[in-house]
């Protein structure tokens, strides 16, 4: 029996301050985390505070498209 669309999907979180600083070339890279979310409970984009090793501080990481 084939399953339909999976409820718990894999999402990628990317540092928002590294993305903004990318235009100025102040950052050496961008921080990304891979996590899961339940699409029924949180249909909107996920935003979490995570540690960014490039900014050396806790920043907001937002969900990006695959």
From Swiss-Prot:
InterPro entries assigned: Ribosomal_bL33 (IPR001705), Ribosomal_bL33_CS (IPR018264), Ribosomal_bL33_sf (IPR038584), Ribosomal_zn-bd (IPR011332)
PANTHER family associated with the record: 50S RIBOSOMAL PROTEIN L33, CHLOROPLASTIC, LARGE RIBOSOMAL SUBUNIT PROTEIN BL33C
Gene Ontology cellular component annotations, sorted alphabetically: chloroplast; ribonucleoprotein complex; ribosome
Subcellular location, record wording: Plastid, Chloroplast
Pfam families on file: Ribosomal_L33
Chief location bin: plastid
GO biological process: translation
Encoding gene per record: rpl33
The name this protein goes by in its record: Large ribosomal subunit protein bL33c
């Amino acid at each position: 029996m084939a399953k339909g669309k999976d409820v718990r999907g894999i999402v990628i979180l990317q540092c928002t301050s590294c993305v903004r600083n990318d235009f100025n070339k102040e950052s050496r890279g961008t921080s990304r985390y891979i996590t899961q979310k339940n699409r029924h409970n949180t249909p909107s984009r996920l935003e979490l505070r995570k540690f960014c090793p490039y900014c050396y501080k806790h920043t907001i990481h937002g969900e990006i498209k695959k």
